[in-house]
Every structure is written in structure tokens, then in C-alpha cells.
């Protein structure tokens, strides 16, 4: 049986490999579809600015916290006052509107750039108490990165979960029938850069565990091959070029191997290749079509899609190809394990679904159309995926608890195959 066609489907490090790429416009911008109704209220006061700063740092912080699905930032029009430090906060003002935590900050010129200082304040105490604070110097061009740093620190303080707002996404943009670009951007679509352009299809980008490389499928030699692209040097190496189709690359957690699918023997099967060369090893044994491999966090398990029982379904096997058992429901595919190994994110019934690997229970997270290619943030809090909107493919964002949903509409073209980076900073 033929699977659906969709199946074929750091700060210093970041600055190093970005400097060698072609810059693109910020072509995707988050637009809220469904807000959060039961998340924790938080107030992010506009940062007091001394000197000309074009970026609204406070708004970026508020957007980050909202995008996680854990917090509901209070609308600016409803803020009772605009303090810039804990000394200016009247706790009663904030508790009267149901806000227990407030973010305040200041931006001042410093060392040919700016100093960004913030405080996260507990207003349940009177006088208010600082929960966490920070201050750092950044060049003007890194103001959004500074805002994401503030968001990461606040998020971790309030949730005990590491923030992932300084991570990146990779995705493919198709314009027309013969113009493809592989791009990398901030998780929220800003600061997009083109990694490679091609007149032939580009598909299925996948980050290496340390964020320094991307594996992806290219048809540049008139047949599908899997290459590993070093984002620092720009060098590319072919890892899989078996006869027929080669697709769906997935790095092992240690970055030394790549699982992928190939139909060199007629049907699609899962293979593992060493990224430094050598003969790929076949893991599945010509039982139906097998594709879309992904690894468990410890590297001991590979999840994949197979139609061996008559229709697509997610299976698991050991990384040596043994102990194959079905996991997902009939019609499930595109499975990815969360960073803690407790959940699988997959597509089922054309929507993004979360499955608890202990209980087997499932939860539908998305309500969009023809969803595919889900990818999870490294802290497991957010999921990016592709869906169909009218005649276009667009990127969508949903929190892992399903509370927050947003779309990242592209300026022009079809946006496909999103892949969330690992952490890129210490």
C-alpha cells in the first residue's frame, strides 16, 4: 500500500552561522487564533526607555509568555500604572485586578549599545518583593534576543522549566513550481535567514542535537538525497543516496547517526547511517512501507510510521530494529517524542494529537486543516506544525496543553516542514 505523499515528506554559535547566510525578511509573524482562558495572569509593563530603541522589549516578553500557554498577559490598556522598578510598585493596585506577578524594566544606552534591566515582582507581598532580576548589555541589533533572554529567565523562575524562547525554527518556503528555500528564523518567525536556495524540491529539515547542522532532503541532483549542512562553514555532505527515494532524516540524540527512509528495495524501509560515512543498515524488513523515523530522548527507541497492517499507524522498535509494536491509533503518523520521553506528538485524523506513553490516553491539540510535520520545542511546551489554509500551506503554533493556538502566516509562498531547534545557548 502506498503511503500518503506527505509521508515523503549557542547565541555565539547562531551569530557565526547566520553571518554566512543570505538574510531574508521576517516573513512569518504570529497571529493569535485562540487565547488562553485558564493560564496564570501576568502583567508586563512597557519597559522605560532612555534613548531611541525601535524594539518594544516588553511586548516581545509578553508575547513569549503568552505563546507558552502558561500565562495570560494583561492588556496594556488595563494596566493600573506603569512602574519601571519594584520601588514604584503599589501591590494593592495589582492584586485588585487579579495580578500576582508583574514584570518591569528599563533600557538605557551603554557601551555602544544598550543595557536591558528587568525585575519580576511578587505583588502578593506588601511591599512587593523581587522574585528574579537581571541586567545585561546588548548591541541594538540584538534587542529581540535580549527580550527572549528576559522571557527565558522569567519563564524558568515561575514554572521551574527551562525557557525556549531563544531557540530557532527551520522550514521550507516554496514559491511557484521551481523556487525553494530552506530558512532558519527565531521561533516566532523574526530574523529569518536563507540557508540554501534551489530550483529543485527541498524537504524535511532536521536539526542536529547541538544545533550546528541541518539534515534535509534535496532533489538538486535530480533524485532525492539526504545531505547534512554545516551551518557554521556552509559545507554539505551527502549521507544517504541509495537507489530510489531517500527521505525523512532524523538525527540520533548523540548526533552520530541518521535514521531515514528509503525504497531502494521496492518498499519504504527504515535505515540508519553514520553521518561520517559507511554503508547504511536496514532496520525494517520489507513489511509494508515504513517511514518517518524519530528517536526517543535516550536513543534506545525509534518511532516510525508503517502501513503493514493495512493503514498508516505509528510503531516503535528498538534502535537495533527489534521488538516492533504498534503505538498510535490507526491513521496516526509523523510521531515525535517529547524531550522527557513521556509523550508522543503525532498527526491523527489530520490534527495534532498528544499521546501519553504510560497511559495511552490521547488529546487533540489542534483544530486546523490537514495538519502535518509537528515539531516540539526542546522544553516540550510548544509545538510548531504545518497546515492548509485555503490554497496555502502555513505554519501553526500550539501549546502542548492545547490552551494557546496561533498561526504564523507567511508573506508569500507555501511554508512547509517546520523543525524546532535544540537549545542554542547555555
Swiss-Prot record:
Q: What is the name listed in the Swiss-Prot or TrEMBL entry for this protein?
A: Tol-Pal system protein TolB
Which residues belong to the signal peptide in this entry?
A: 1-24
List the Pfam families.
PD40 (PF07676), TolB_N (PF04052)
Chief location: periplasm
Looking up PANTHER family in the UniProt record yields: PROTEIN TOLB, PROTEIN TOLB HOMOLOG
**What GO CC annotations are associated with the protein?**
periplasmic space
Record text on subunit structure and interactions = The Tol-Pal system is composed of five core proteins: the inner membrane proteins TolA, TolQ and TolR, the periplasmic protein TolB and the outer membrane protein Pal. They form a network linking the inner and outer membranes and the peptidoglycan layer.
Annotated Gene3D superfamilies: TolB, C-terminal domain (2.120.10.30), TolB, N-terminal domain (3.40.50.10070)
The organism's place on the tree of life at top rank: Bacteria
HAMAP family to which the protein is assigned, alphabetical:
TolB
Q: Which family does it belong to?
A: Belongs to the TolB family.
Amino acid at each position: 500500500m502506498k503511503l500518503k505523499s506527505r509521508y515523503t515528506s549557542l547565541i555565539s554559535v547562531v551569530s557565526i552561522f547566520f553571518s554566512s547566510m543570505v538574510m531574508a525578511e521576517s516573513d512569518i509573524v504570529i497571529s493569535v487564533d485562540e487565547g488562553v482562558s485558564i493560564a496564570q495572569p501576568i502583567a508586563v509593563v512597557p519597559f522605560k526607555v532612555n534613548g531611541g530603541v525601535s524594539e518594544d522589549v516588553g511586548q516581545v516578553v509578553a508575547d513569549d509568555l503568552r505563546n507558552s500557554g502558561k500565562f495570560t498577559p494583561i492588556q496594556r490598556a488595563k494596566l493600573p500604572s506603569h512602574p519601571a522598578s519594584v520601588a514604584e510598585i503599589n501591590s494593592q493596585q495589582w492584586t485588585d485586578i487579579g495580578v500576582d506577578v508583574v514584570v518591569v524594566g528599563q533600557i538605557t544606552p551603554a557601551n555602544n549599545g544598550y543595557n536591558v534591566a528587568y525585575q519580576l515582582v511578587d505583588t502578593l507581598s506588601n511591599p512587593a518583593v523581587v522574585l528574579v532580576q537581571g541586567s545585561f548589555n546588548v548591541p541594538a541589533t540584538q534587542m529581540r534576543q535580549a527580550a527572549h533572554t528576559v522571557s527565558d529567565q522569567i519563564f524558568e523562575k515561575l514554572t521551574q522549566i527551562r525557557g525556549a524562547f531563544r531557540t530557532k525554527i527551520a522550514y521550507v518556503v516554496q514559491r511557484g513550481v521551481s523556487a525553494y528555500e530552506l530558512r532558519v528564523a527565531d521561533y516566532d518567525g523574526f530574523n529569518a535567514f536563507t540557508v540554501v536556495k534551489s530550483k529543485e524540491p527541498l524537504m524535511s529539515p532536521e536539526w542536529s542535537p547541538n544545533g550546528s547542522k541541518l539534515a534535509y532532503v534535496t532533489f538538486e541532483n535530480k533524485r532525492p538525497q539526504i545531505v547534512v549542512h554545516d551551518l557554521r562553514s556552509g559545507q554539505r555532505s551527502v549521507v544517504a543516496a541509495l537507489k530510489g527515494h531517500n527521505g525523512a532524516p532524523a538525527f540520533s540524540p548523540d548526533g552520530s547517526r541518521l535514521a531515514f527512509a528509503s525504497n531502494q528495495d521496492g518498499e519504504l524501509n527504515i535505515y540508519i547511517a553514520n553521518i561520517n560515512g559507511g554503508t547504511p543498515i536496514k532496520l525494517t524488513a520489507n513489511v509494508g512501507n515504513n517511514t518517518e523515523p524519530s528517536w526517543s530522548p535516550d536513543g534506545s527507541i525509534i518511532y516510525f510510521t508503517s502501513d503493514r497492517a493495512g493503514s498508516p499507524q505509528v510503531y516503535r522498535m528498538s534502535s537495533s530494529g527489534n521488538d516492533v509494536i504498534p503505538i498510535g491509533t490507526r491513521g496516526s503518523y509523523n510521531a515525535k517524542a517529547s524531550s522527557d520521553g513521556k509523550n508522543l506528538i503525532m498527526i491523527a485524523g489530520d490534527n495534532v494529537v498528544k499521546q501519553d506513553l504510560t497511559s495511552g490516553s490521547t488529546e487533540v491539540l489542534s483544530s486546523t486543516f490537514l495538519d502535518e510535520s509537528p515539531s516540539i520545542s526542546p522544553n516540550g511546551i510548544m509545538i510548531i506544525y504545518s497546515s492548509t489554509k485555503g490554497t496555502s500551506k502555513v505554519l501553526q503554533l500550539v501549546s502542548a496543553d492545547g490552551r494557546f493556538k496561533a498561526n504564523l502566516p507567511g508573506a508569500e509562498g507555501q511554508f512547509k516542514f517546520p523543525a524546532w531547534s535544540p537549545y542554542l545557548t547555555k
